[in-house]
């Protein structure tokens, strides 16, 4: 019999890998109610514009699923004690709300009548799971202080549903204990969140950063950190393109001024060869100095004072270039123009041979064509 290795993780790894493979492609089309209470408005704008794909591993995806699996059990618990729960609309779908032309929305876990604390009052239902530490904080401080995003989410649902109370139910993932808390509708908070949502959807550029550098506590582990404080360029898709606009006439529509058409979600995710980064998203390393009607943009590289152009460099090449000092470099420009070279992902000066003369103007000639036999 073949001896077992000292430690086996193959089965667990395969399970997590399957979660990653089956995860929904791309980011969700709308700005979620669960996000709008986030402390950083810049984060929300970059998220709405798909500036960087969230990178969740299989374990995290399974953890999210565990939270979703708790919802039907809590509904069954409520019905078992005589509470009337409405968790589906007339079409059998989860209750869903949309706002700001369909670009903002969320799915409410349900509404309940007959809760022991107030049997005659309809409540918005919000279900969450938490580890022991977070659970203890919620019990001690309440949801508004310990989980302000959850509190804001319920304010939106109450405002959209026309209800003035919510019931917050949280399950301790370690002990299966349940914390229940009634929440009162705050009209000022609802209006603030709605105005914020409208500002994010219609804004042509993001808000300023929360901190002065990437070591600021709230920024330290943010996925947009390198775009806000370093030279990372955004991912290429229609939402990071200066030609696209979120329209406000319903159905979460986006339009493209370059191709004069409405964009499907799939088209938004793919982008096209005419993509041009929203200039401010390259503001850490480049400044737009000229733009013409032929979609030709000229930038000044802030690191080197050299100029570079789109279409010489595609948006994807700008994003893929790790060392942004390459953009506009004389040899890099010559290689691009004369030899139709391509900047690949992770490119930088360190990847080039040591004997290449990177200083001064260099003219690279096209290779001679081979003589025909």
Give short role names for the model-derived ranges.
Residues 1-124, 131-133, 273, 281, ...:
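Metal-dependent nuclease catalytic cores that hydrolyze phosphodiester bonds in DNA/RNA
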Residues 4, 19, 24-27, 32-34, ...:
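Short, flexible coil/linker segments at or flanking structured domains
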Residues 111-115, 171, 257-259:
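A generic structural motif
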Residues 120-127, 164-168:
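Conserved active-site beta-strand-loop modules that form the wall/rim of enzyme catalytic pockets
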Residues 128-131, 172-173, 260:
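A short beta-strand motif that forms part of the nucleic acid-binding face
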Residues 137, 141-151, 156, 160-255, ...:
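Metal-dependent nuclease catalytic regions and adjoining charged, substrate-binding loops involved
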């Amino acid at each position: 019999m073949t001896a077992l290795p000292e430690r086996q993780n193959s089965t667990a790894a395969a399970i997590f890998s399957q979660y990653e493979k089956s995860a929904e492609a791309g980011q969700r089309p709308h700005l979620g109610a669960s996000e709008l209470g986030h402390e950083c408005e810049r984060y929300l704008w970059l998220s709405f514009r798909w500036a960087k794909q969230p990178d969740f591993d299989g374990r995290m995806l399974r953890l999210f699923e565990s939270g979703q699996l708790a919802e039907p059990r809590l509904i069954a618990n409520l019905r078992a004690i005589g509470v009337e729960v409405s968790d589906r609309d007339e079409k059998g779908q989860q209750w869903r709300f949309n706002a700001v032309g369909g670009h903002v929305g969320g799915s409410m876990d349900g509404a309940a009548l007959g809760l022991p604390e107030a049997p005659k009052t309809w409540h918005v239902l919000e279900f969450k799971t938490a580890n022991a530490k977070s659970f203890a904080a919620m019990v001690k401080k309440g949801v508004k202080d310990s989980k302000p995003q959850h509190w804001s989410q319920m304010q939106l649902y109450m405002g959209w549903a026309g209800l003035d109370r919510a019931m917050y139910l949280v399950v301790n993932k370690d002990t299966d204990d349940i914390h229940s808390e009634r929440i009162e509708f705050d009209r000022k908070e609802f209006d603030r969140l709605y105005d914020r949502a409208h500002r994010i959807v219609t804004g042509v550029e993001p808000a300023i950063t929360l901190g002065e550098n990437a070591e600021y506590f709230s920024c330290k582990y943010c996925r947009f950190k390198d775009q806000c404080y370093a030279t990372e360029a955004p991912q290429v898709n229609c939402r990071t393109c200066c030609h696209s606009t979120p329209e406000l006439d319903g159905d979460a529509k986006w339009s493209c001024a370059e191709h004069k058409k409405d964009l499907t979600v799939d088209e938004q995710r793919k982008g096209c060869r005419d993509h041009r980064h929203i200039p401010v998203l390259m503001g850490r390393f480049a400044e737009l100095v000229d733009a013409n009607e032929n979609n030709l943009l000229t930038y000044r590289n802030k690191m080197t004072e050299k100029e570079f152009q789109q279409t010489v460099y595609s948006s994807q090449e700008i994003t893929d270039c790790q060392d942004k000092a390459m953009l506009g470099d004389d040899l890099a420009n010559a290689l691009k123009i004369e030899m139709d070279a391509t900047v690949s992902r992770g490119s930088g000066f360190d990847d080039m041979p040591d004997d290449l003369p990177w200083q001064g103007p260099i003219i690279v000639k096209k290779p001679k064509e081979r003589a025909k036999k």
